[in-house]
Regions:
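Sec-dependent N-terminal signal peptides
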Residues: 4-13
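C-terminal motif of bacterial Sec signal peptides marking the signal peptidase cleavage site
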Residues: 15-17
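A short loop-to-beta-strand scaffold at the N-terminal edge of the catalytic core in hydrolase folds
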Residues: 53-63
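Short beta-strand element of the alpha/beta-hydrolase
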Residues: 68-77
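The serine-hydrolase catalytic nucleophile loop
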Residues: 78-90
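Conserved alpha/beta-hydrolase
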Residues: 92-111
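Conserved acidic catalytic loop of the alpha/beta-hydrolase fold
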Residues: 122-142
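Gly/Ala-rich beta-loop-alpha elbow adjacent to hydrolase catalytic centers
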Residues: 146-150, 154
Length: 155
């Protein structure tokens, strides 16, 4: 009986100490809005790109680590996804290649603008260039591997 009384008293003390402190001015939308801290989680980094209609973010994911051989994979589409290129995750890093998957604007994990003026080949080519620069890829360490539409952008 004494143990039950002590346990009840401990629970009441614990509950009494749980009080909400001053409210926050943060809205629900602000709380859940994604913030890019620059930290890469599981190799993922959102890259900001500038377009004629504003800034957007595109998704990238890095596998492996090789300062001299980095391969940026360009998927087909436009507006297809990186998913069918995921098979390279099992091969490239094992062979010493660093690879970077990326979803072009309007694709899967990247922003989805509704402005049809963005869907031009020169704008997508400029996007690849902005991604290249943001990921610090240059002629000494960087290769493009594009499939279908991605091959057109790579040329």
């Amino acid at each position: 009986m004494k143990k039950l009384l002590f346990l009840s008293f401990a629970v009441l003390i614990g509950l009494a100490s749980c009080q909400q402190k001053g409210g926050s001015n943060t809205t629900v939308g602000e709380y859940f809005a994604p913030a890019d801290s620059g930290v890469q989680v599981a190799g993922i980094k959102m890259v900001s790109i500038q377009t004629p209609v504003g800034k957007f973010r595109v998704w990238t994911k890095r596998f492996g680590n090789n300062p001299r051989i980095k391969v940026l994979l360009l998927h087909g589409g436009p507006a297809f996804t990186h998913e069918y290129l995921e098979c390279f995750e099992s091969f490239f890093p094992k062979e010493g290649f660093e690879m970077i998957e990326y979803d072009q604007l309007g694709s899967y994990y990247s922003d989805q603008p509704r402005d049809s003026s963005l869907w031009t080949t020169p704008r997508f080519v400029e996007e690849v260039e902005q991604v290249r620069q943001a990921l610090k890829l240059d002629s000494s360490n960087f290769y493009l591997l594009g499939n279908s539409w991605g091959g057109l952008l790579a040329m």
